[in-house]
């Protein structure tokens, strides 16, 4: 099967002015979101075509500054001493950095006494190596077995490129974590993750990673009915990995959409199996959270 990958040919400015909305979150939560739109990207549930890029950067940073000073967060939790803001929920910031004044954004968090920025990425942007955020930007490299990355994350950096970039980003002044997301359960999934863990260990050994600083976050797959139908309509490969109702259950998202996730009893067992395998091979990679 041949796939047609469309590249951005033009950016059209929308006449309607965008507005900054004051944001808030539930008690005890302190993450905020403003892609490479891969086959499993949740953003395509809401925006099937194209990509939205925020251009009112200074307005957004002003709101973040106000929130950081006047938020109800009483003390830091396990994530660190700063309030953490996700600066790239609706796109892959590293890939689309050319559409942003990224140095201003990174500089804002570098110099802010209370806040730090964070983003997950599937792309190695070498331009970032020339900027030292002094530990105030967290880069979370998304990882899955390479076999499935090629299918589900086309046109993104290979696992070798991502893993080779880890020590370079650390040396440049970034905090770096590994983002195992999404974890997809299928035949031989644990065998493939065992190989991935061996690959990570090999990179960490030969490239002299500061292993204590490289932590993990783990998110098992959640899929969406609208995205499922989109994938089928456009004949995107790999859908048989994502939509497996016999081992999944439905849930209604906060946006009102119909999602599916692994049935909760099965998922509890999957998490135990994955964690056991992870800790056997890369115990130094502390898991911050897994769900």
Model region roles, listed by residue range:
Residues 1-40:
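Autoprocessing domains of the Hint superfamily
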Residues 79-83, 113-117, 134-137, 172-176, ...:
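Short, well-ordered coil/turn segments that N-cap beta-strands
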Residues 201-291:
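Auxiliary Fe-S-binding modules of radical SAM enzymes
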Residues 91-95, 124-127, 139-156, 182-187, ...:
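Conserved radical SAM core fold
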Residues 166-180, 187:
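A conserved active-site cap/scaffold subdomain adjacent to cofactor or substrate pockets
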Residues 188-203:
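Catalytic cores of alpha/beta
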Residues 42-140:
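Conserved Radical SAM active-site core
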Residues 156-169:
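Glycine-rich S-adenosyl-L-methionine
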């Amino acid at each position: 099967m041949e796939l047609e990958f469309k590249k951005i040919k033009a950016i059209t400015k929308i006449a309607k002015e965008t507005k900054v909305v004051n944001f808030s979150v539930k008690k005890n939560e302190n993450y905020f979101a403003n892609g490479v739109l891969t086959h499993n990207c949740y953003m395509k549930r809401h925006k099937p075509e194209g990509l939205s890029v925020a251009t009112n950067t200074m307005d957004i940073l002003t709101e973040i500054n106000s929130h950081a000073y006047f938020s109800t967060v009483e003390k830091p939790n396990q994530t660190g001493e700063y309030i953490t803001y996700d600066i790239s929920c609706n796109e892959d910031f590293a890939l689309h950095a050319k559409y942003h004044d990224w140095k201003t954004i990174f500089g804002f968090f570098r110099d802010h006494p209370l806040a730090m920025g964070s983003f997950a990425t599937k792309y190695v942007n070498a331009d970032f190596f020339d900027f030292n955020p002094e530990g105030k930007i967290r880069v979370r490299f998304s990882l899955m077995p390479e076999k499935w990355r090629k299918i589900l994350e086309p046109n993104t950096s290979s696992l070798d490129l991502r893993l080779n970039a880890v020590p370079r980003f650390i040396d440049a002044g970034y905090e770096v974590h590994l983002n195992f997301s999404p974890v997809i359960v299928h035949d031989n999934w644990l065998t493939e993750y065992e190989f991935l863990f061996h690959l990570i260990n090999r990179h960490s050994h030969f490239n002299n990673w500061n292993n204590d600083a490289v932590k993990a976050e783990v998110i098992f797959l959640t899929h969406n009915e609208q995205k499922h139908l989109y994938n089928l309509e456009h004949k995107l490969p790999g859908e048989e990995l994502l939509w497996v109702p016999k081992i999944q259950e439905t849930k209604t998202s906060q946006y009102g959409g119909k999602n599916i996730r692994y049935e909760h009893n099965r998922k509890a067992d999957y998490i135990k199996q994955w964690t056991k395998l992870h800790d056997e091979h890369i115990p130094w990679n502390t898991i911050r959270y897994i769900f």
